[in-house]
Design a protein with these regions (language model features):
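N-terminal Rossmann NAD(P)H-binding glycine-rich loop of SDR-like oxidoreductase domains
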Residues: 4-26
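Mid/C-terminal beta-alpha module of Rossmann-like enzyme folds, strongest
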Residues: 219-289, 299-320, 327-380
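Alpha-helical substrate-binding/gating segment
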Residues: 185, 190-193, 203-240
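Conserved glycine-rich Rossmann-like NAD(P)H-binding loop of the short-chain dehydrogenase/reductase
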Residues: 28-41
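Conserved beta-loop-beta element that borders a ligand/cofactor-binding pocket
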Residues: 160-186, 227
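Conserved Rossmann-fold NAD(P)-dependent oxidoreductase catalytic core, especially the SDR/UDP-sugar
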Residues: 84, 102-152, 175
Length: 380
């Protein structure tokens, strides 16, 4: 049997790059075709692979149908990972809707234009954001849950609409894999106002970047059963990666050698609701089919992320708590997306994320937002 051709969008993003690496490690079975924007960054990333006959780069744009068609033509698998994500999606909501839905339409149109469209297997990467606000006690769910995006979350709306483009197209082989938060070394250095949109009492079931990349390669293997297709699944690295957002923040700060959240953040900086995230009743369904998890213990994984950071991140541990807090404050007060900017300047967002002025004023200490322990091993 000859090699299969895999067309991958979003290959220079976090998940897409991990998927490309996994596919490249299996290049004896796969030819990999990538659609990438013609930028200096992408040219540098892909330069080591340009001479490899197993890799073809289509320099183009997801919003240009002709470019997408060039990638899809002759492909056995189409992995649509590309699109706009946070934080860019938060700053450019209208463009996010246009790009994420428009690119889905281009991919579907290109697949249906092929003479063997019924044989092409199409994978769409959705998002946990599609489920909307699921704070406890409503924090358990599954892929069949209603999709109700959080207010002002244009990214979530774009992912719902894009998934519907695929689901309603009549494709014979289509699957939506809804991605959760991805753990990768760079996340430890991410700091923008959206960090404070996350309620400390909320939850998320994380997926490692390695598991996510392995998943993209596994789905292209011949042994994937026919019964797998035409469904939606949730992606996660398993029960041990279930955390409250407070627990995650503690782990992240601790990994960087920084003090606890109580010492570097004011509790009022964090929203109380209107985000997304849940723990999955069906967490193992996808794993049972694709076997993509490495099952690295979560503490070991955070330690490995730290070991991969540039050396200067170690300097963070030298900063006293008061200095870290002083550094964080402008982020919470940033114009536009800062939660504390909303207090006086954006009553609609303030109400959506806090509920009311009374609820906001009632946050007097960390005791008011610190969540009680939750049983992460048994769905309620």
């Amino acid at each position: 049997m000859g090699k299969k051709t895999v067309f991958l969008t979003g290959a220079t993003g976090n998940m897409g790059w991990a998927g490309f690496q996994e596919l490249y490690a299996r290049k004896e079975r796969f030819d990999i075709r990538i659609l990438a924007r013609d930028s200096r960054k992408n040219r540098k990333m892909l330069k080591p692979y340009l001479a490899d006959p197993s890799v073809t780069v289509v320099w183009g744009d997801l919003m240009r149908y002709e470019d997408v068609l060039s990638g899809v033509a002759g492909a056995d698998y189409v992995l649509h990972v590309g699109g706009m994500v946070s934080p860019a999606a938060d700053y450019y909501p209208e463009k996010t809707l246009q790009v994420n839905v428009g690119s889905a339409e281009n991919v579907v149109k290109a697949v249906l234009a092929q003479p063997d469209a019924s044989e092409i297997k199409v994978v769409y990467i959705g998002s946990v954001a599609q489920y909307g606000d699921r704070n406890p006690p409503h924090h358990w769910g599954c892929a069949s849950e209603p999709q109700v995006p959080a207010k002002f979350d244009m990214y979530a709306l774009s992912k719902i609409c894009a998934e519907q483009v695929f689901a309603s197209a009549g494709l014979k082989h289509f699957v939506s894999l809804r991605q959760s938060g991805i753990l990768y070394p760079g996340i430890l250095g991410v700091l923008n106002p959206t960090a404070f949109h996350v309620p400390m009492g909320g939850v998320l079931e994380w997926a490692t970047i390695e598991d996510s990349g392995r998943l993209l390669a596994q789905v292209c293997e011949d042994w994937v059963p026919e019964s797998f297709w035409n469904k939606a699944y949730n992606i996660s690295s398993g029960a041990q990666y279930r955390m409250t957002n407070y627990e995650f923040m503690n782990r992240m700060l601790g990994t960087l050698g920084l003090p606890s959240p109580e010492k570097v953040f004011e509790p009022q900086w964090f929203a109380l609701k209107n985000f997304h995230g849940m723990w999955y009743k069906d967490a193992d369904v996808l794993e049972d089919v694709l076997h993509f998890r490495a099952n690295v213990p979560v503490d070991e994984y955070f330690a490995s992320m730290k070991s991969k950071l540039p050396w200067f991140y170690t300097l963070a541990s030298l900063a006293p708590a008061w200095a870290v807090k002083l550094f964080m404050k402008p982020v919470a007060f940033a114009e536009g997306l800062g939660t504390q900017w909303w207090v006086e300047n954006d009553p609609e967002r303030f109400e959506a994320y806090y509920g009311s002025r009374e609820a906001y004023d009632a946050i007097r200490s960390w005791d008011d937002i610190r969540p009680a322990p939750l049983d992460k091993w048994r769905a309620e």
